[in-house]
Amino acid sequence: MAPLDEGRSCMPIGYNYTSTCTQGGYPTYVVNVSTVAQIQLSVNFARNQNLRLIVKNTGHDFNGKPSGKGGLSIWTHRLKDKVFYPSFTADGGYVGPAIKLGAGVQVSEAYDFGKELNVTVIGGGCLSVGVSGGFTLGGGHSPLSSMYGMAADQVLALEVVLADGRFITATSKQNSDVFWMLLGGGGSTIGVVTSMTVKAYPQLPTTLVTFNWTMNDTPNAEAFWAAFQSYLDNFEDFVNAGTYGYYFLGSSGAEKGEASSGETDYNFRMVSFVAPNMTVPETQNLLKPWFDTLNSLNVSFIPIYSHADNFYEVWEEDNFPLETGGLDIYKLASRLLPRNVFENQDLRNRNFLAQKDAVDKGLFIMGFHISGKGSAVEPPTNIAVLPAWRDALSHVIVATEWDFTSSWETVYNSSLFVTDWMDALREISPDSGAYMNEGDLLEPNFQQAFYGANYPRLYELKQKYDPTGLFFALTAVGSEDWEVQVTDPLPYSWNNNGRLCPRSS
């Protein structure tokens, strides 16, 4: 998914920079596993031969974690088993329906399985992502998070192959420190997860709304931006109601990698406004204060409503738009914005001005109104999900794109610009953090941003269960003890296209 981190060494046909295709940062060895025993053999072989070890599920990672020059990759994509338990008794006290998912089960497959059983499974927005890989291990936000919390909150039991080759079950009471670490502490840390058993909820009637407006749909630029600002003013009410919104904000050129500072062909697109357990009239009533403001500003927009007696049907009808993978034309950074940013008028205004500034400078926003706590359930306290998620009302991704033929210098400067720009949101949320799965490879103090107060214990457990550092991934727990000796012109200190070596003191 992120060829930039492999050194642009083997691009898809039509996007290659030269006529050659070299190994670059792609693993040298790949084991297409279908059994736990094969994973154990692979882990033991890599450890005994001192090979760099990589874990890959579907490869959906913005920062190149499924790659590594000269490494051995364990590919878990074929672990597709699914088992339904009508009544599952978990160590933590949960009693109810549950589903066991093999590590290779993708979101679409989990959703389809749940639909057949008339239950709801918490998965991600993108249907092709693996449920039991880095998505859930990094926390995992969902269109249903504002109601039920993070994907990691749903896990009742894990099966894991540890760095020493042992195959264990981890629950809140059995191997509880492994359970705690893996649920929020990220993937590629101390073991290979082979399956997860997760909660299954009743089917949930859901309404979904989409709409957009462009600069041409408003009387002037002031009205365009006032319309967006009024959305931010309603975040608290939307999240408190258990809804989720995914929006795009930027110029048409920004989506094509052709944006320039000062371009004013702006558009706002509500990709998905998800209202679980709400009818269309109830959703319309919730949106009315915002829509009244848009109408008073003479903004032209047409909301399209869809409703079904289960979440899956509306999401499959209009879910995350699929994007072209395998291209190195983007760089992103993100920030979780806590509730106080929206309660405080000054902070809310600074948030608005920051996002406007990003768009004015040729960047684009992929943002969410979302809660990582969940309005219908209490989040567990025995897992390592980034604490900032529990107080967040928004997850904001700021990104840039460039033409795929851009020079290394352009890529480098564009990347640093996004990292530096994110200071505007860091400053209004100094005690918050960023979602590791959609975060900046160059995030300053990634330990605090991605893991928060959990990091000291996470690092301690890393030394306990993987003292030799067999498992490594960019920005993962303990990765500061290692460095990649890069061989390509991109002067990142973090890059997969090079030999992995212990960091000199």
Language model features with spans:
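Soluble FAD-dependent oxygen oxidases
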Residues: 1-505
